[in-house]
Amino acid sequence: MSEFTQDTVQKPIDELVTWVKQYDFSLNLPTERLAFLLAIAVLSNERFDEELGEGELHDAFAIVTRLFAESGEASAFRANNAINDLVKQRLLSRFTSEMTEGASIYRLTPLAIGITDYYVRHREFSKLKLSIQLSMVADEMAKAVESAQQGGSVAHWRKNVFGVLKYSVSEIFDRIDLNQRVMDEQQQSVKEQIADLLNKDWRDAINNCEALLSETSATLRELQDTLQAAGDELQTQILDIQECVYGDLELDFIEETLSALQMKLDRITSWGQQSIDLWIGYDRHVHKFIRTAIDMDQNRAFSQRLRQSMNDYFEQPWYLTYADAERLSDLRDETLTLRDEEVTGHVPTEVEYEELQQVNDELAQRIGDMLKVHKEQGAAIDLALVLRDYLASHPRTHHFDLARMVVDQAVRLGYSESDYRAIQPDWTAINDFGAKVQANVIDRY
């Protein structure tokens, strides 16, 4: 909230309501009317006196109407109605003088300037990165800190410190606040796009994921790289100036300004942390959607379509887009856990220097020999039953690693015909501790 708005809020609310009621203020700006008002503002800025004649307003209306083809032709009658509507809403002031021979001239009212200025700034700041704005405010704060450390008369403080803080730093803080609100709108848009993924065809959904990941990653990178560092720097600069004015009653106005800036900085950094958490959540949602896109299709239609696309490649060529991301480090130790809390006695000499990998290899060989019996007899391998029987004779702490070895050895022996029919197996329990496996019966060797 700007300082001007804060001063206004301090007035009694009933007084403001009475003022609005007394002058019958009201706004009704459809998209076409708002575009017309912005066109008038652009033309006014190009004029030295910021005054426009009726002919220029008609030209602006014609430009807007051409872009809104569905609204109808740009007739003089419709243009006059639009002009009169803006005058009635106190967005345009109409003047008639003898010098213009009865023709009216028009100027934007303060209300219209406020509205158009907001939209123009909104468009500018949506393109201006947060990092640039934070760099700008840090430079201005550095000037104020340097002047404060030099010291001087009250006039020096008002000119070189208070002036910079009040009219430069504070203004940039307000711009940052506006940029944050723009990013809030962007965040809401991304949230809606993620929700729409579930309602799209799988091809469209996967294509949208690429754009969403680019947007979320770029935003996260900007927030994380700039907010924390810039926030610490600005906080240090504010504390440096406070140290210079501490205990000096003549510089209370500097203290008040610093307090207002501190509130704005706290709001910016707090918003930044919340936004980082939100964007991390959105980024994870998109990654999760990509990981589960195939599993969500219970009939394995995705796999069928992929195989069909491979078969039809020469008749209907296509491009393959893939992401080559860095592998994430898995901190879980995949090797068997050796527990020695209650180990007593001596280790046999023949295994004292035996490596754990060698133990794993021997264990995998035993599992492979066990499964080969199914292949030799031509019997199918139901991994759920095999795992349940095999794990029952081993400690619970070894179940995960042993199950991985069994599955690894089984898929080396053969495959399941059901996989090629896009049949999805059910989840089946393999121990009494909640572990489950989803695998078709291996019946082809």
From Swiss-Prot:
Gene3D superfamilies: Chromosome partition protein MukF, middle domain (1.20.58.590), MukF, C-terminal domain (1.10.225.40), Winged helix-like DNA-binding domain superfamily/Winged helix DNA-binding domain (1.10.10.10). This is Chromosome partition protein MukF. GO terms for biological process: cell division; chromosome condensation; chromosome segregation; DNA replication. SUPFAM superfamilies: MukF C-terminal domain-like (SSF140570), Winged helix' DNA-binding domain (SSF46785). It holds the Pfam family KicB. Belongs to the MukF family. The keyword Calcium applies. InterPro entries: Chromosome_partition_MukF, MukF_C, MukF_C_sf, MukF_M, MukF_M_sp, MukF_WHTH, WH-like_DNA-bd_sf, WH_DNA-bd_sf. The keyword Coiled coil does not apply. Interacts, and probably forms a ternary complex, with MukE and MukB via its C-terminal region. The complex formation is stimulated by calcium or magnesium. It is required for an interaction between MukE and MukB. Residues 213-241 are annotated as: Leucine-zipper. HAMAP family: MukF (MF_01803). It is found in: Cytoplasm, Nucleoid. Involved in chromosome condensation, segregation and cell cycle progression. May participate in facilitating chromosome segregation by condensation DNA from both sides of a centrally located replisome during cell division. Not required for mini-F plasmid partitioning. Probably acts via its interaction with MukB and MukE. Overexpression results in anucleate cells. It has a calcium binding activity. One of its GO terms (cellular component) is cytoplasm. Keywords: Calcium, Cell cycle, Cell division, Chromosome partition, Cytoplasm, DNA condensation. GO terms for molecular function: calcium ion binding.
